[in-house]
């Protein structure tokens, strides 16, 4: 991948692993676990709002690369950049402020709807494994009946 003139930025480990696997399956690009952990080709921002602190890395250290930015279109309960349109606007406004044009953005899960990489993964699960989600959904329903209990994050389900 070192000869490909792109660098990828994403929100978290799940996104990073998904993108690594996608590149391997569809483009035969191998990224080792070590390179993934060291953010060599796919930069794990750890949070969408940390993108705004990446100016030096994106426009100076990676000036010869095109930046591909993958962010979740979280709902309004999760973030102030809620939804597809606000996520696109957030990235475009930031890149405009930096006067940076060598980028593209893809909003997960499908570049049109609100959601996360976990929503995408849930929708593409092998039908043989659907029983696991049915069981998990019952578990969440049971927990939701008691307000003193916390329902696990969707990342736990996936």
Positions of PLM-derived features:
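C-terminal accessory helical subdomains adjacent to catalytic cores in phosphodiester-
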Residues: 3, 20-38, 48-158
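Short glycine-rich substrate-engagement loop in P-loop NTPases that contacts/grips substrate
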Residues: 44-46
């Amino acid at each position: 991948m070192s000869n490909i003139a792109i660098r990828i930025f994403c929100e978290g480990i799940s996104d990073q692993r998904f993108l690594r696997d996608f590149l391997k399956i569809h483009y035969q690009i191998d990224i080792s676990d070590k390179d993934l952990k060291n953010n060599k080709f796919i930069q794990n921002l750890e949070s969408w709002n940390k993108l705004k602190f990446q100016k030096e890395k994106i426009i100076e250290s990676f000036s010869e690369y095109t930046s591909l930015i993958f962010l979740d279109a979280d709902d309004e309960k999760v973030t102030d950049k809620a939804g597809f349109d606000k996520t696109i606007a957030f990235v475009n406004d930031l890149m405009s402020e930096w006067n940076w044009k060598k980028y593209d953005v893809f909003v997960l899960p499908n570049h049109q709807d609100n959601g996360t990489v976990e929503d995408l993964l849930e929708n593409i699960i092998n039908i043989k494994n659907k029983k696991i989600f049915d069981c998990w959904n019952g578990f969440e329903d049971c927990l939701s009946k008691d307000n003193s209990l916390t329902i696990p994050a969707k990342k736990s389900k996936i």
